[in-house]
Amino acid sequence: MAETIPLNPITLPLNQISLIEASAGTGKTYTIGSLYLRLLLKAGENNFSRPLNVEEILVVTFTEMATEELKKKIRERITDAINKLTAFAKTQDKSAFKNDEFLTALCDNLNIFEAIHRLKLAEQNMDLAAIYTIHGFCRRMLMQYAFHSGIHFNLELIKDQSDLLVRFANEFWREHFYPLDFESANFIATELVSPANVLSLLKADLGKDLQVEIENKQALSVPIQIFLPQYLGGYQKALNELKAFWLESADEISAIITNELVKDYPKDQLKSLNRKKYQVKRLGDWINKINQWSNNPRDYQINTTLKDYFLQSSIEKNCEESTDKNKDKKPATPFYSPIFADLEKRVNALMTPDLLSKLTLYHYRQGLQQKLLDYKLNHQEKSFDDLLRLLCEALQDAQGDELAEMIRFQYPFAMIDEFQDTDSQQYAIFSKIYRDNPEKNTGFIMIGDPKQAIYRFRGADIFTYLKASDEAQSRFELTKNYRSEKHLVDGVNALFDFPQSPFIYQNIKFTAVDSRDDHLRFYLNGKVEPAYRFYLTESDKVNKTEMAKICAISIQHWLKSAAENQAVFQNEDTYKTLQAANIAVLVRDKNEAALVKNELQKLGIASVYLSDQNSVFDSNVAKELAWVLKACLNVAERPILNAIATALFGLNAADIHQIQQNEADWQRWADSFAQYQQTWQRQGILAMLHQILLEQGISERLLSQATGERDLTDFLHLAEILQQAATLHESEAALLSWFEKQIQGEARQEAQIRLESERQLVKIVTIHKSKGLEYDLVWLPFLAAPSKDPSKKYINIYYSKERDETLWDIENRNLNALCEETFAEELRLLYVALTRAKYQMAFALPAQFDKKWNALHYVLSQGEIGKEINLSDSKDTETLLQTFKEKMQDNVEICTKPNLEALPTLSINTKNDDFKASEFTGNIEQDWRITSFTSIEQAHRRQNYFTESAGKKHAVFDDAKDYDSQNAIEISTALLNENESNILDLPRGKQVGTALHRHFENCYFSDLANTEEIDKLRQSLQLDETFTESLQNWLQQISHTPLSNEIGIALADLANKDCIKEMPFYLAIREHFDVEAFNHTLKAHHHLPSESLQFEQIQGMVRGSIDLVFRHNGKYYLVDYKSNFLGSTLADYNQEALKKEMLHSHYDWQYLIYTLALHRYLQSVVPHYDYARDFGGVFYLFLRGMNGEPQSGVFYDRPSVELITELDGVF
């Protein structure tokens, strides 16, 4: 492992594999920007072999928000560098760099004018910068190098595959558990509860390469169909035999023990049974309990009384014990009876229900993953995790080296941000691209901080980071904290800088960092505040409600002082008053957030929970809105009364009673809801809800309440969602039914609750969400909460150092390793929490720490409490804090008896700025648009319409699609059944073309006649079962028709990895589409007598979708399927007829456009691509004419190099 050295951004080598460890607040983003500038300019020492442009520098991070932020920061650095270099070029005075040490050092060996030119180009092209999320990068590579990845161009990215998982979890439950006998089904229902419960247990680890650690490997290897009868059924059978044996033997057992209890022993002999435990009266109760258990088919657990008192080993343990009084007596002779030995043998032969339940869960997991995999093999939906898996697999297969080389060629340099959040699959991808085949002209930098690896629950793997760290050629670290005031930095150094592994693992080191000396300080009522303030409760227990109250009152005092201009941040040059938005309260989850928010609300302090993941459908407003919609849909007494009884209308019981009693009042309400119904029907639901909002004064009413902003935000959000959903539902009733299902949680769409306000509010945020952020003042009210016992988890997963694998410890044999992982992450979470503040942190702690392990307790004791969940004794909190205070001198305040008292409710005034809409003064070009071949061809025909003779009118508006006109005469199914052999008489029209295209898209070409898929095709064509054989024969003929005598290949010969189906494209028109130049080019170089195109000049893009692109013998071919009906005989599909149809429908224009699009695509992804050498040609397959004979129904052309080259200039 390379030694870690301080980073110098000027000298860091850029042509190797390096790792940068960036502790919290040490300027990681600034460092990335500095290295980016060096790469753009080929500047500094140990620089890259050539200057790179923004498209060649790959920067990968893990969230969309981080990606946008990083792009913004890099753009700002480039702009700043342009301004400073420009100023320096004019003055040659280094003061132009304004104390920018990096640029000052960088300019020493820089051609300033060339550098400014390159930076301006980079600034202009930042929208093209290769700054992506990990999933965005994977998707781009899969699509761009589709022939190497085998990915379908029409893949549908699904952010949330919950609906699929629910579907497959239910399927598995039905398929395997419904047929079980009563006892086995009872076991499943009790242990696994429901498919939803199983998903909640498995979801976090689905898709991981998870090995199971268990002694009985066979229980894992058998399929579920064998596991259930052999193991679950076998358990129930053996258990029933045990119960039956007990019932048969109960009287005998009772007699044996009774005889022993009344047996006389010599006075100098200890008894074989302890008669204080075993008594005749107790014996009867014990046996009755076990009898009841034996007669209860629902109870599958081993009875504890049976285990404790009637097994041979437990009886031997329960002999009379030697004491001081009877120490002279002879030892007891162990009591033995074959019946107890037999009972023990039977019990020990049983697998524990806990293990059996986990094994069943393992098989459920395997079945669920297989269902998901099978589904995705046959469908285009792909999740984010699938993108990673597919790229990783593509890089490992036979063409993986070539794919890695192409990616390396495209991105010779890569930086991976937040690398501590990586996993083994992500590292395998970048390892394959950059580490396995290092080249002189490539560089790879991993940037992260193992101390901030807190996303294990999302699949992040700290051990992958540590492995990558060991494999890096060089390791660097950032050594100065720019975020926090000096004394806060000193405090973190004091807490974590101790020898006993502050982060549990030896290879996660803590290095004390330096800090700035020019930071502001926090002053309260004229006095400088300590960096750390601890409030100790009088209770020894963690009382979260009390701690939340202390936190809220402390914040109230801060804000009161701020209102009096007595809470300020200042130094000699700068002064600013504390605002509510400067304060953050860090919590672990929404429950803690609710406690704090509630206490703040009591004191009149508005706050916002920034980590709210709840659905808006779970809000009270959603339920009340459902009542309102019911009344609008059904204008009747009961629905209207239910609606106006909601909080939205603000009526009380007396008001509603008055409405019921007063006919005029009631009629007004009935008329209102009738009007709302009409608005819904005529203008839509959004218009209706806005009408209700205005007429009923709902906004004013809600905003007058404490939770008003939250409720109004939810109302408006739901109105938007309902408006969007209305487009998908045919009636108001259907929309209301959908809305009620969303509230109930059925197949719920993603609708995360929105922030209620962006005003100056106290922020409440989870520690996980706060990572990477900073706040002026930070409150940590719940850090003393004891750690949860990791062994209590149902699924225990840990990393095995010996096996270098993630293991499911199904038998709980390695709880020490599990505890280490859990505690290590708790410490990393603590580190993140303690490094968010800029000026002060405040804590609420109990008088004593609990006897359970706690991360803050661990660092305050400098690791002395060890790594066991249960501690020997509790520790006095004040004593621990005093040790910390001694190191920090005057920068720690310990309040042992918080004398905070709540003040009167605050009224915080916020300035409301007046806003005015800007006036648009620009000019929008109206001729930019996205068109298609179909639009171009139809426009051409419309132009010709006015010059053609009336006798040709019937053909003017032919759609020129891949199928016959919608107006073509349909052949009935009845006629088809009379003449099944003539496939040429298939129905005509759009439906047929669409169905055939879908069939070709979904099937392997070697399996076009697959019975299951043929049935789907037949049904979509509305043909009965008698047509199945004809369809199969026809599709067999299509797949085996040689496309060309020259290349000698049929569709059936194509490997799936050499095909891209339904390849969409956007062909950019570089300037304007020059119609005259297009016609001139065709006349000069096109061998078909194509007519002149009549079309307007436009700019923009031409879009389309190529049915098939395939690769054969190193050449690329374009294929289009046509289901056009040309006649009832095969002679109607000969080469002359096909050529005539190609010209009549202008398909030659289509394939020239498609060829140009494919040509440009291949230029961008195939190294050293050459059209003359690499492009094979175009096949148009007229499916009705393909009968297995060479080139039957197949039109082929290969546009000349000159034609495509000139067309490339036309578009």
Swiss-Prot record:
Source organism, top-level taxon: Bacteria
A Pfam family hit: UvrD_C
Chain residues that bind ATP: 22-29
UniProt EC number: 3.1.11.5, 5.6.2.4
Catalytic activity: Exonucleolytic cleavage (in the presence of ATP) in either 5'- to 3'- or 3'- to 5'-direction to yield 5'-phosphooligonucleotides; Couples ATP hydrolysis with the unwinding of duplex DNA by translocating in the 3'-5' direction; ATP + H2O = ADP + phosphate + H(+)
Named cofactor requirement(s): Mg(2+)
Occurrences of domain UvrD-like helicase C-terminal (ranges): 500-772
Domain UvrD-like helicase ATP-binding, residue spans: 1-485
Active site per UniProt: 1120 (for nuclease activity)
Family annotation (InterPro entries): DNA_helicase_UvrD-like_C, DNA_helicase_UvrD/REP, P-loop_NTPase, PDDEXK-like_dom_sf, PDDEXK_AddAB-type, RecB, Restrct_endonuc-II-like, UvrD-like_ATP-bd
One GO CC term on file: cytosol
Stored Gene3D superfamilies: 3.90.320.10, P-loop containing nucleotide triphosphate hydrolases, PCRA, domain 4, Recbcd, chain B, domain 2
This protein's record includes keyword Protein biosynthesis: no
Gene Ontology MF terms: 3'-5' DNA helicase activity; ATP binding; ATP hydrolysis activity; DNA binding; exodeoxyribonuclease V activity; magnesium ion binding
Ranges where the record places region Nuclease activity, interacts with RecD and RecA: 927-1211
Family matches, as SUPFAM superfamilies: P-loop containing nucleoside triphosphate hydrolases, Restriction endonuclease-like
CDD domains: RecB_C-like
Ranges for region DNA-binding and helicase activity, interacts with RecC: 1-877
Additional information: In the RecBCD complex, RecB has a slow 3'-5' helicase, an exonuclease activity and loads RecA onto ssDNA, RecD has a fast 5'-3' helicase activity, while RecC stimulates the ATPase and processivity of the RecB helicase and contributes to recognition of the Chi site.
Family: Belongs to the helicase family. UvrD subfamily.
Entry remark concerning the domains of this protein: The N-terminal DNA-binding domain is a ssDNA-dependent ATPase and has ATP-dependent 3'-5' helicase function. This domain interacts with RecC.
Official protein name in the record: RecBCD enzyme subunit RecB
Organism field: Haemophilus influenzae (strain ATCC 51907 / DSM 11121 / KW20 / Rd)
Gene, per the UniProt record: recB
